[in-house]
Amino acid sequence: MCTATTYRSQDFYFGRTFDYEFNYGEEVTVTPRNYPFPLRHQNALTEHYAMIGIAHMAGDYPLYYDAVNEKGLGMAGLNFPGNAVYSKVQTGKDNIAQFEFIPWILGQCANVQEARVL
């Protein structure tokens, strides 16, 4: 289970626990602009914003738990066991795997409005 909290004032603050019983080898990870992110069902994401967050490195691929991009947009992939639903690949849709979602959004969007459109 993960716990996240936000505090809204003139600024916006986000915090998150990483309360797992064991370690996944996560580490602070910086992905520079335009580092290639191969995607399973789309062309690789090769032009994108830089980001920093907590990730497990699977080879050269950062599996982000949470991150923020250079524009200040951040997101977290919280764990809710038993509640995830995964659809089959659909022609004509953006088919983004769960582990690709954080870099896919943060790489292309500067703010929440852009993420909603995407």
PLM regions and their residue ranges:
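Alpha/propeptide regions of enzymes that mature by internal proteolysis
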Residues: T91-L118
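A contiguous strand-loop segment
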Residues: M1-K93
